[in-house]
Amino acid sequence: MYHLYSHNDLDGVGCGIVAKLAFGKDVEIRYNSVNGLNAQVQYFLEKAKESNRQDALFITDLAVNEENEERLNEYVHAGGKVKLIDHHKTALHLNEHEWGFVQVEYDDGRLTSATSLLYGYLIENGFMKPTNALDQFTELVRQYDTWEWERYDQKQAKRLNDLFFLLSIDEFEAKMIQRLSTHDEFFFDDFEEKLLDLEDEKIERYLRRKKREMVQTFVHEHCVGIVHAESYHSELGNRLGKDNPHLDYIAILSMGSKRVSLRTIHDYIDVSEIAGRYGGGGHAKASGCSITDEVYELFVAEAFRIDPVRPDAFRNIYNLKGSANGSLYENRAQMRFFLFPLDNEWNIQINGETQDETFAAFEEAEWFIKRNYAASLVRDEVFVAFLAENLKLANQHRK
């Protein structure tokens, strides 16, 4: 008998689907949260010891703690079979054990996923044969879990994850197993396509609303965008990161589950290291941790007093970013920032006072005022009134 304990996200459930296609009724699968795995593993090992059974155990997309690390060693030394397959770099130390198989990226530089690693492992060890449909499915899971879908605009990968969240785990699992075992190609049926189109519209409305709720602050040395959200963390983190490139990372708080999701679009930030400070982990661009007392104070209590950042005006005709006529910004404290080009450099005027520091590019000047003052591009009518007032003052000085 095989047992597979996996994460309860798309990549984790993808492992369960692959395992059921390989082992059929001979595998028992349980999906766990990050915090729930260790209790599950401990219970399995205790029951195995009591019954003197040595079933094979797969652990995928999750890592065990030190106590279970030792217990798994004892189980293997007693004749039990264990294989832990993961792709998070925070689990690389488990490769010290013969039962550990942790690989962050392939030889060609592509990032791995637990589903793609398990699929490759089962094929290599003769447990299953590859198919076109499974190749396509596991690749979509990998692309979504590693954010590669966003880089190459692979919307099918995102839609697969959307479908995963629209269905129960049991229903999603059953649909995928039936489809992958009876078709040569992976596809969404007509009903799913319509359902996913409606979901796209719903997500877009949700992202627009949450964009207006984000606050900005410094947490230690990093400039962070903080927002409370229960859904669509990947899409939200990606959108907020792209719209606010001056932010080092986005922290998405889910108070119901007492979890924080950390997302970044930058290569110079590794949010798995940040999550590691608070007992969490994950990938360089997507990680998470529990809301401990320390995390609550930093990301909830202190941020609660801060007003949300106003989004940049997006329907302007005149007040445009990088315009030769200048660009006008304002923050919640009613401070005004006028960015204008002069002698091949960009200058900043704060409340009418031109600053000594200049910038080689508009993006650098905007990054400075957004990061340090949480400024936002104002609407055209405010910009036109500002120009009219400055023109009036200039004419008065000439007189």
From Swiss-Prot:
Disruption phenotype: No visible phenotype. Cells show normal growth. GO terms for cellular component: cytoplasm. Its cofactor is Mn(2+); Co(2+); Mg(2+). Keywords: Cytoplasm, Exonuclease, Hydrolase, Nuclease. Its main location: cytoplasm. It is an enzyme of class 3 (hydrolase). The keyword Nuclease applies. Optimum pH is 7.5-8.0. InterPro entries: DHH_sf, Nucleotide_metab_enz. One of its GO terms (molecular function) is exonuclease activity. Its EC number is 3.1.-.-. SUPFAM superfamilies: DHH phosphoesterases. It is found in: Cytoplasm. It comes from the Bacteria. PANTHER family: 3',5'-CYCLIC-NUCLEOTIDE PHOSPHODIESTERASE, OLIGORIBONUCLEASE NRNB. Degrades RNA oligonucleotides with a length of 5 nucleotides in a 3'- to 5'-direction. Less active on shorter RNA oligonucleotides and on those with a length of 24 nucleotides. Prefers RNA oligonucleotides containing adenines rather than cytosines. This is Oligoribonuclease NrnB. It comes from Bacillus subtilis (strain 168). The gene is nrnB.
